[in-house]
Amino acid sequence: MSISRRSFLQGVGIGCSACALGAFPPGALARNPIAGINGKTTLTPSLCEMCSFRCPIQAQVVNNKTVFIQGNPSAPQQGTRICARGGSGVSLVNDPQRIVKPMKRTGPRGDGEWQVISWQQAYQEIAAKMNAIKAQHGPESVAFSSKSGSLSSHLFHLATAFGSPNTFTHASTCPAGKAIAAKVMMGGDLAMDIANTRYLVSFGHNLYEGIEVADTHELMTAQEKGAKMVSFDPRLSIFSSKADEWHAIRPGGDLAVLLAMCHVMIDEQLYDASFVERYTSGFEQLAQAVKETTPEWAAAQADVPADVIVRVTRELAACAPHAIVSPGHRATFSQEEIDMRRMIFTLNVLLGNIEREGGLYQKKNASVYNKLAGEKVAPTLAKLNIKNMPKPTAQRIDLVAPQFKYIAAGGGVVQSIIDSALTQKPYPIKAWIMSRHNPFQTVTCRSDLVKTVEQLDLVVSCDVYLSESAAYADYLLPECTYLERDEEVSDMSGLHPAYALRQQVVEPIGEARPSWQIWKELGEQLGLGQYYPWQDMQTRQLYQLNGDHALAKELRQKGYLEWGVPLLLREPESVRQFTARYPGAIATDSDNTYGEQLRFKSPSGKIELYSATLEELLPGYGVPRVRDFALKKENELYFIQGKVAVHTNGATQYVPLLSELMWDNAVWVHPQTAQEKGIKTGDEIWLENATGKEKGKALVTPGIRPDTLFVYMGFGAKAGAKTAATTHGIHCGNLLPHVTSPVSGTVVHTAGVTLSRA
């Protein structure tokens, strides 16, 4: 059945969030009102998916309808706490705007004309087109992208079986800079022991809005215990408002301040010399690189007074090793992302806070923990080994630049899909398969994305909603929500081993299916069935658990299991508790720590303050240093963005409860700037640059620099399902140019714009 936009269903109101159901044939959307509270009640443990951190949860269900979600008390770091996004999962499941049947585009891309089809027809047509593209252009011409985490593993399994090396997560548009910096220096990332820190410095990392429930609670605990917090941020974020000090740093000035702090620590010998000598390489090159980066120099670069830089550095060092410079998350402020994140890790290294209470630490999975304990404390997870699984032979499109070798091995440079499609280099991309990925909100330069999808031969979107990106697809495959599916066991180890399990809470609505099942069935239609030896998720879970039925039962009952005691390798009291628990543990060092067991997966086996590998890949990048770059023109204002506590990037603006909580992203304007432009709060304004033009509303506030404008990201969608949050506000991607930072491969989230009244 085919239908035009004029014949589509009319909108049904849910508060202010569901402005219209958009353009769908009858039966394509969900109709599932929440049942009353009378009836059989169950509590099911699972994992949240309202953001990428996957907090353990419990869902209360009445008559097969989810009515309440809370944190899982079996997970002590979080307990029953949950954020607004996690609690809104009820609204997600029962949203009448959900896609619940496969659909095929019948009109121009993005115009919203769809036809309901069967799963079999969808699989047959998509597989036929993929195989035709493979035959003509090679399997590498099909790109696969997904949100990070469990959603990506099954899609990437399909990509590998199909023969394509081009798999991507959203990492290059969000957290990759931090992870790549850690990989360059140490071979792997580090976590924060926030609850026990005495001093924390943040460069734009806003844990009170970019919420990670456990870390956010730890931050509150640290502040209650008297820890000092210092925020360097161009705007007064929620974290800045709760910090002891807020310094309105110039956008892009972070690296200069970090280099100056390093200069002070080395010049005044405030660093942990014994740690540096034992665990690092390249200190001499680092010291030479920061010899001239004085606080006075940085003050001119960043608008932070020199005496503030000196004082904060001294205070930070005085609290070491129980002190942290937060490595951050989504915040590519400039082209110098890789060096900024490296300098943050470098300051932590100079503090000697690695594997110390209130510092940074390596996560300890079952294999590591069991080895140290001298016995099997926690079960290890078996890795799926598929016999004769093919290995793609073509080069990845993002490895045309060798500097991206680190991110290519992880989430990849997703915006390279645009480059390849538009330039046909190193070879053309002809198809794009997306799983819960909304690049139209997260990738910069929206106009380039439109050009990209318009010239592709095939675009497939697997999603819960008709997102802005899904609106440009040829086929929509309805995925069920995280509360309607089972998934693999997740390793959530931190200071000791821990596993968690996402399991089905309620039955799927309509014909929606789990993404693992969708990609498995498409793989079978592609003739790749031999690479799918499992029949259901329970079989795969049991394989991971090495056939341990008792463990599987316990994990399903509790949803979260952990083993052992917290272990910090260089903290004597922590090691004492560990060895008391496990008498057969390996011998401690003479100082009663496990300092000799601290290893790093870098080429030298140490923390590399100077990277010979990076210097070879990109001359001049061996050590961090400031380089000339421009974020805006002289007549422009800085344009920056950030996260808000009630939304996740561009993913949750469709969820009714969250859309009601926040449905617009007013532009923060300093009173001085507003007066110069004749602008008042609530006025309609234009932001414009060479990339695009956006209309929004002004919010005049002193909580922003006079030369800077700020908005929350994820609003102002120009296609897809219509809610209050998607139809209002500034679309950030329409104002950010297509700029990729070196080495990290991340998109730059700062630009220049002009401001005027509408």
Curated annotation (Swiss-Prot):
Cofactor: record remark: Binds 1 [4Fe-4S] cluster.
Post-translational modification (record): Predicted to be exported by the Tat system. The position of the signal peptide cleavage has not been experimentally proven.
Gene (name only): phsA
Function: Component of the PhsABC thiosulfate reductase that catalyzes the reduction of thiosulfate to sulfite and hydrogen sulfide, with menaquinol as the sole electron donor. Proton motive force (PMF) is required to drive transmembrane electron transfer within the reductase. The PhsA subunit contains the active site molybdenum-bis(molybdopterin guanine dinucleotide) (Mo-bis-MGD) cofactor.
Cellular compartment(s): Periplasm
The species this protein was found in: Salmonella typhimurium (strain LT2 / SGSC1412 / ATCC 700720)
Presence of the UniProt keyword Iron in the record: yes
Protein name: Thiosulfate reductase molybdopterin-containing subunit PhsA
Group of enzyme by EC: oxidoreductase
One of the record's GO cellular component terms: periplasmic space
Gene3D superfamilies: 2.40.40.20, 3.40.50.740, ADC-like domains (2.20.25.90), Dimethylsulfoxide Reductase, domain 2 (3.40.228.10)
Reactions accelerated catalytically: a quinone + hydrogen sulfide + sulfite + 2 H(+) = thiosulfate + a quinol
Residue sites binding [4Fe-4S] cluster per the record: 48, 51, 55, 83
N-terminal signal peptide: 1-30
Keywords assigned: 4Fe-4S, Iron, Iron-sulfur, Metal-binding, Molybdenum, Oxidoreductase, Periplasm, Signal
Cofactors named for this entry: [4Fe-4S] cluster; Mo-bis(molybdopterin guanine dinucleotide)
Predominant place of localization: periplasm
InterPro entries xref list: Asp_de-COase-like_dom_sf, MoPterin_dinucl-bd_dom, Mopterin_OxRdtase, Mopterin_OxRdtase_4Fe-4S_dom, Mopterin_OxRdtase_prok_CS, MopterinOxRdtase_cofactor_BS, Prok_Mopterin_Oxidored, TAT_signal
Pfam families reported for this sequence: Molybdop_Fe4S4 (PF04879), Molybdopterin (PF00384), Molydop_binding (PF01568)
Enzyme Commission (EC) number: 1.8.5.5
Keyword Iron carried by entry: yes
A GO term, aspect molecular function: molybdopterin cofactor binding
